[in-house]
Structure formats: structure tokens, C-alpha cells
């Protein structure tokens, strides 16, 4: 990683925000381990991201084509089909490259939770949103959490969680 970690506790951060960032990072584990060195021992890390399998988890809303930007789940197509569809809809090369990069970096709830354990963070709190709070401003929809029972249904929860919010701290191990 390019940025050198602070030398002493006073130079470290109380709060680090990763909102809609982690799903764009290829080496997530290495990145999170490096972030630990910037966090005060009493600090918290916020990680917010769209679950990969949710209807627009591939960020296809950035497409110019109405078909691609409004069609849910197309990012789950095999790479060759997805790439061909984007080209057929005349998406720009830069957009296609960005969408394929997001597809390569995809982040499921299970992946993040595995990384949290591997990187020795503890979960202070988490929320799985059925209707992302940002959708109030964007689409005039009322935010709502996924029902609690659904939080426990691994893999299936990814299809219904439009935003995952985690507050983490350093494990005392």
C-alpha cells in the first residue's frame, strides 16, 4: 500500500468511513489489514456497500442505455454475455471497463464477514437495508431494513439487501 501508517496513536483516526468503497477494491483483505494501522485502538471503521447479488449490485445504473441501466440482475450474467450485452447497448469502453472491474471485485455479505474475521475486526453493529436510505433522496422511497429473520439466511440475503452497513472495531486478541 502506498500510504505509510501513522507512527503513534495520536496521529491515528477515531473514525474511518468506507462508504461505497470496498466493492471497488480488488485486494480487500490487504486493504483492510493496512487500514487497521490507521485506526486508533478505540476507533471504529464504518463499511457500507451494496451486496453483490442485489438487483443493481453491479452498478449498472451508470449505463447510458435505458435497458442496461434499468434492468436488474444483468451483472450476474456470465462475463462474456454481460460484456456482449453492454457492447450491444453501445456502452462506452470506459463504462464497460468500470462495470467489468466491479464484477471482478464483487463483494457479498459472506465475503465481507469472512474478511472481518480474517483481519481480526469485531462487529459492533450491522444493518441490512431492503430499501437503501439513499433511495429516499434519489427515488423518494422510504428506507426500510430487511426483516431480521432474513439477516440469518446466508447467500439468499444478498439478493434482497440493497445496502449493508457495518461498524467495526479492532478485536482485542
Indicate residue ranges for each PLM-predicted region.
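A conserved beta-strand element that flanks and buttresses the S-adenosyl-L-methionine
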Residues: 17
Amino acid at each position: 500500500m502506498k500510504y505509510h501508517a501513522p507512527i503513534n496513536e495520536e496521529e491515528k483516526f477515531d473514525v474511518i468511513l468506507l462508504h461505497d468503497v470496498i466493492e471497488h477494491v480488488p485486494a480487500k483483505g490487504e486493504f483492510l489489514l493496512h487500514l487497521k494501522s490507521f485506526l486508533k485502538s478505540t476507533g471504529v471503521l464504518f463499511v457500507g456497500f451494496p451486496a453483490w447479488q442485489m438487483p443493481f449490485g453491479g452498478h449498472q445504473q451508470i449505463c447510458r442505455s435505458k435497458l442496461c441501466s434499468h434492468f436488474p440482475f444483468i451483472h450476474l450474467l456470465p462475463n462474456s454475455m454481460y460484456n456482449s450485452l453492454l457492447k450491444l447497448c453501445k456502452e462506452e469502453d470506459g463504462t464497460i471497463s468500470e462495470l467489468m472491474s466491479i464484477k471482478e471485485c464483487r463483494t457479498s455479505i459472506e465475503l465481507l464477514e469472512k474478511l472481518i474475521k480474517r483481519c481480526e475486526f469485531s462487529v459492533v453493529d450491522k444493518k441490512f437495508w431492503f430499501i437503501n436510505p439513499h433511495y429516499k433522496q434519489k427515488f423518494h422511497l422510504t428506507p426500510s431494513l430487511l426483516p431480521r429473520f432474513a439477516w440469518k439466511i446466508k447467500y439468499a440475503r444478498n439478493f434482497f439487501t440493497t445496502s449493508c452497513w457495518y461498524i467495526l472495531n479492532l478485536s482485542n486478541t
